[in-house]
A protein has these predicted regions:
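PLP-dependent amino-acid enzyme catalytic core
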Residues: 1-342, 347-350, 356-374, 378-382, ...
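Short, basic/hydrophobic alpha-helical segments
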Residues: 384-386
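Generic C-terminal helix-cap and adjacent flexible tail
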Residues: 430-438
Length: 438
């Protein structure tokens, strides 16, 4: 089939029926919308082109720089499109956690500016947040930049309303259940709105990451409230998945269906199957279920290798930090803000700030040391660098990630705690912050 431009390949992705012998659900037909078939590898190709297609000629004429807050698939798609049209692309982020994504953006000529966010998600009330910084940058020089604004731009979900949803309906007609990952919420909002207009009984189920866990492309339920195009009323349920279960779902998709989806796709697949096992009991007629396969597994090999090293024939302890599941650390001991001063005075703990180095330099708890969470997790896989006789207090942006470290060390016999509410609560309480010298 002949095409004249790469953008003509965006959309019209296949819909794959999952063999009932694989999912083993009675009276259920499961279909995977394979967004991996988009030319740049993910469902975000639709969003990037949907935002740019009516503006690109003017952007080129003005020689503007496309700018976005992205550390993933939207950034990759925008970088390719900018390169095709001979213009610059700049991404603002507070940390790119997947090395392959960083390398790919560099390969495609993107300019990457890494900023210290107090949180790993957009916070419009925080002037240090990357999204707020980006908006200030654009406002200061509006003629220079074109801000695609994926978190609030209606064209994000319109791309899925006008295309993805229509494609699914053209193939299947009425759909009973639709499952999707929640990041910007554009795909679930657009698809579900289109499908629900044609079948009012559609059930839309969103999937988020467990608090304190990291699944590329997914946010946790608290972070979703900070995404402008997220509308909670559209969802009949929102399911939570941790990284280990997401990888189990991903591996099942790969090995049993030949679908090379990444961790976010695995999260949706795992959550969907667990949910339908309960819901489908007693169904007498067939139900049609659709889920989105967001992107490909190859982007995330380093992420997978850390969490499932045995797949790569690497030997690590069975109780590795990366093997922790969400239920393990929910009850991890925390120090409440009103208890902090007394705790610091009586325990004299070693304070370990697990945020990125830039965030630490801008403001940190006095006498704390900085070991970013991804580095600390790697270190703990092979040993514990802290003295056993010393009490340890872990600090992170919101008090979620620090719980994992506190639980892990408590299990090893250490006195370890998490700062409840993290640095965000510390700042709200106007407690002392130190700034590192430049």
């Amino acid at each position: 089939m002949l095409y004249n431009h790469i953008t003509e390949l965006i959309g019209n992705t296949p819909l794959l029926r999952i063999d009932p012998a694989v999912h083993q659900l009675a009276n259920v037909e499961v279909y995977a919308k394979l967004e991996t078939y988009n030319p740049f590898g993910s469902l975000k190709d639709r969003v990037a082109w949907g935002i740019l297609k009516d503006e690109i000629e003017l952007i080129v004429e003005k020689q503007q720089t496309i700018i976005e807050f992205s550390s993933g698939n939207t950034g990759k798609a925008l970088a390719v499109l900018a390169s095709l049209y001979g213009i610059n692309y700049e991404t603002i982020t507070n940390r790119i956690k997947v090395p392959e994504v960083h390398d790919m953006l560099r390969l495609m000529g993107a300019s990457i500016e890494v900023l210290p966010g107090m949180s790993e998600c957009p916070d419009p009330n925080d002037p240090n947040d990357p999204l707020s910084y980006l908006e200030q940058k654009v406002h200061a020089n509006p003629s220079r930049y074109f801000h695609t604004d994926q978190y609030r731009n209606a064209k994000n979900y319109q791309a899925h309303y006008e295309h993805t949803g229509q494609e699914i309906f053209a193939d299947l007609g009425a759909v009973d259940y639709f499952f999707g990952a929640l990041g910007t919420a554009g795909s679930t909002r657009g698809v579900s709105t289109f499908l629900k207009e044609r079948y009012a009984d559609l059930q839309t189920i969103g999937v988020v990451a467990e608090k304190g866990d990291f699944i590329p492309g997914l946010r946790n339920v608290d972070e979703m409230s900070e995404v402008g195009i997220f509308d909670k009323a559209l969802y009949q349920d929102i399911l939570t998945v941790d990284a280990q279960d997401a990888l189990s779902g991903m591996l099942a998709l790969i090995s049993q269906s030949g679908v090379l989806g990444g961790p976010s796709s695995g999260a949706v697949y795992y959550a969907m199957l667990q949910y339908l096992k309960q819901q489908s009991q007693g169904w007498t007629g067939p139900k049609k279920v659709v889920f989105i396969v967001c992107d490909r597994v190859e982007w995330y090999l380093s992420y997978i290798q850390k969490r499932r090293p045995e797949l790569f024939e690497q030997k690590v302890p069975e109780d590795s930090f990366w093997k922790l599941k969400a239920d393990d650390f929910k009850q991890a001991p925390s120090i409440a803000p009103e208890q902090v001063e007394r705790f610091l005075r009586e325990e004299d703990p070693l304070i370990v700030d697990t945020r990125g180095s830039l965030a630490y330099k801008i403001g940190h708890v006095p006498n704390s040391i900085n070991i970013p969470d991804d580095k600390l997790a790697d270190i703990l896989t092979f040993g514990i660098p802290f003295p056993h006789e010393r009490t340890i207090l872990f600090v992170c942006p919101k008090g979620d990630i620090s719980k994992k470290f506190a639980f892990f060390l408590q299990r090893k016999g250490y006195k370890a705690y998490s700062l409840e509410g993290g640095m965000i609560q510390w700042r709200k309480n106007h407690q002392q912050l130190l700034r590192s010298p430049a």
